[in-house]
Amino acid sequence: MTYDLICVGAGPTGLACAMEAKRAGLRPLVVDKGCLCNSLFHYPANMLFFTTAEKMEIGGLPMAISADKPTRVEALKYYRKATEHYDLDLRLFETVEGLERANGAFRVRTRRENGAREEHHATRVIIASGYYDLPRPLGVPGESLPHVSHYFTEAHPFWRRQVVVIGAGNSAAEAALELFRAGACVTLVHRGERVKRTVKYWVLPDIENRIAAGEVKAEFNTLVTRIEPGQVVLRSTNGAAAAERLLPADFVFALTGYNPDFAFLRAQGIELDPQTQKPAVNPETLETNVPGLYVAGVVVGGQHTSEIFIENGRFHGKQIIASLH
């Protein structure tokens, strides 16, 4: 079977692309190496989204919730129901290993979770693979130790433990607060001089007040130079000759952001800007330099992952499908 298009990624953007395709009378296939909305599933268990429900809706379907902003659980339920409504053709837990284009169509090579290889064919492909799978590495010794993670899920296991949170954005601030409220001894470490101003408006004063009260410790203008069992090694950014010092750490959360899979994009022949890693696209159609190959969602922004969210990436499907007529 040859599909009209294959969407690589079953997050909100990939689903929105497939829904727009079905509304236009096309036959789409959605492929994802994880579960439906895999990134959202791996968000912190108690996460509350920054944006309101109507700005997360896809396929023209309302998100009916009791509060203004959806929780992670409510968002996952909505996207399941929306997918069922459109009866999308999905291949979950199936990894895309590569694409080949010949005679005006694509051959998409995949590997299922049992190791079996498959091929799917389509006249067009949309890469909407997100970015949450690839943390931005600190690049310091000890980063791969078992007590270090780039993902925070919930705080309970860390009650009365010494926890270091590296970063000062939304993820780091929310993790630090949740850990503090669960009884952990938390220290926030950030190379900048303060918590980022882009932190959610209801979280920012909370974390700043906890720091001011000494309930969450903070090491600003500070770098982690290496991680060791039971401790991290810190160095101040104020002066090249600053002495290193030790900070106890039973667990370390390095919440310093994530990147799209640039290597995968390059492997498909997509040209990336050497500075920003933004893919070369037609801004009107989101078609890349490879004919018939499109990008959607946060992938469009390259390293500037804060430019595109669910609330604006969800419209990329309309933009792409409209260009096909």
Task: Name what the model sees in each region.
Residues 101-104, 115-188, 192-203:
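Predominantly flavin-linked oxidoreductase catalytic cores and closely associated redox partners
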Residues 10, 129-130, 256-257:
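Glycine-rich, N-terminal phosphate-binding loop of Rossmann-like dinucleotide-binding domains
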